[in-house]
């Protein structure tokens, strides 16, 4: 298991180097790296039939796309903002575009036009479903969870299809839907609250998502494998952290 953590630390360092830009660093916060997504991309690409020399580039590339998407999400939609805030907003958009350009550059160097198409398709799907969540145009509970799953894991879905590794589609979706709901802001949780009329509380819905993610990890990954143990522990940590924060806020 120590080897996994060492590999992830190395990937994290290389990703930060790619994401580093001296001018942007002066004006906006460094992009946050989702270490759970880094872990799952590492595990997925470990199973892919690709050269060892290319594996690291694929992982970094996928995470650059994720960073670009996350950075664009940081852009404020407020109409009235101060001059300095407007500059930060413009630079945040620029940063997201810059990170997108990096992934195109890496894949073009590898001459992998098919992966460019794969990631572009995922980006299109993610943006479409972000709009659905933003304007609440989903029809029902299933529609809502489908959109959350696509926003959080479409990159994994498309990459898994590209390399014919179907189990990572369900596993990534179940895990990241749970994580997104646990880390959601008040507005996001209010959407969940609208489903209470179906006879479930927010807590029961979150518990169902936890069990679903845990079941996927236990049934789709080798028993007691390092990646299975790490993901089970992460699920528990995410759940415990949120419970702790709720208790603190409630006093």
Swiss-Prot record:
The keyword S-adenosyl-L-methionine does not apply. It holds the Pfam family HEPPP_synt_1. One of its GO terms (biological process) is menaquinone biosynthetic process. It catalyses: 4 isopentenyl diphosphate + (2E,6E)-farnesyl diphosphate = all-trans-heptaprenyl diphosphate + 4 diphosphate. InterPro entries: HEPPP_synth_su1 (IPR009920). Heterodimer of component I and II. This is Heptaprenyl diphosphate synthase component 1. It comes from Bacillus subtilis (strain 168). The gene is hepS.
